[in-house]
Amino acid sequence: MKVIFTQDVRGRGKRGQVKEVPDGYAQNYLIKRGLAKVATKGNMNTLKRVEANEKAAYEAEKAEAEKIKAELEKDDTIVNFKSKAGTDSRLFGSISSKKIVEGLEKQYGIKVDKRKLNLPEPIKTLGYTNVHAKLFKGVEATIRVHVTEQD
């Protein structure tokens, strides 16, 4: 019997895959537990529509990430912060990924999730710092952060 897997089944198939399986296994296990559906014409058309929608959503998300990357990598896109500092250029406090994301949104209107930033530890010195951001699978950008001393 041909079935369409609705979930991953270890050793049998992945979600969205169409496979031939024994009738008893399909009826008594896969279909009963909601792991698969019978591969009828209607179900096949639904599967194609769902795959097309998922692909379109993936492409839209990737295009949005590319757009954000292009905006971040412009020469004039530098996130500026003013902070109090000591004599050795060390900040009183620090600039975290949360503050960087807030600064990006406030200064340029760019929204980025703070979890996408690769900042091992907060910025604690004055000057320029490059912060890498993984915006999407295969789309990475560099955010330039400039910390100056507050008067």
Swiss-Prot record:
The keyword Ribonucleoprotein applies. The keyword Nucleus does not apply. Gene3D superfamilies: Ribosomal protein L9, C-terminal domain, Ribosomal protein L9, N-terminal domain. GO terms for molecular function: rRNA binding; structural constituent of ribosome. Keywords: Ribonucleoprotein, Ribosomal protein, RNA-binding, rRNA-binding. Belongs to the bacterial ribosomal protein bL9 family. This is Large ribosomal subunit protein bL9.
